[in-house]
Amino acid sequence: EAGIRFYNQLIDELLSAGIEPYITLFHWDYPYELYKKGGWMNDESPEWFGEYAKVVAEKFSDRVTHYFTLNEPQCFIGAGFFQGEHAPGLRCPVKDTLLMAHNTLKGHGRAVQALREFGKQPLTVGYAPTSTILYPATKHEEDVEAARKAYFSLPDVENWSWNVSWWSDPVIFGAYPEEGLKKYEAYLPKITDADMKLISEPIDIYGQNIYNGRCIRMGQDGKPEEVKRPAGAQTTAMDWPVTPQCLYWGPKFLQERYHKPIYITENGLSCRDVVSADGKVHDAGRNDFLANYLAEL
């Protein structure tokens, strides 16, 4: 109840300031009591997520019309339970993480259903994964197609979680990509037609968190290859590459594949900020970053 009260007040304040709020249902903060029951490993977890979405719709949809179900499943499953770099810092077997991923996507489907059923007005519902954008070295057709092919390809099983297609094809097309079904066959959970119908509940918009990318060209062997960045190329305070081109090519490739309105749901950088003598952070680096990225749209 305290959480609902807080968000009710926040929504009202945003609206009073002329700001349209968007709600993301899940941005990695899993309830501990449900985590102790297995979290996304538990086959009941999609139902739990649907019940939660029902409450959100009942409490907030009189004022909020735009919703994203999940934020960056590649991170909260991959980095959280596979690489062990994010909370809860586990390194689970491949088979377990693929089951978690499947339940996560089923939870997305249950949330879409709940938002549609219990929304107090027509709602705009989306999904917000992330990726490292692969952009072409030139606008020549062979480089563009090399970048596109590499972007939607599936990594080998030891790095399976960081990709586009495994997380998005089921949501849009109602099927996992064949390349992944072959590569990950020995580790897959049971996947039913009913599961895929649930996962592919129709959405209205597709979000993408875009920060940076890698440059790709067609190699002499006819396969995509990465073009290495020159020494001294610009990076952020977190040592992420600054690649404005990704804000053009990422949405372009995603829209051409999935045919949904593309929302850039996150973008930005960490800076080495300093307080100037006048007591202000003038933020020239961030201003420059945003101007260069936005110029690519």
What residue ranges belong to the model's regions?
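Active-site region of glycoside hydrolase catalytic domains
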Residues: 5-296
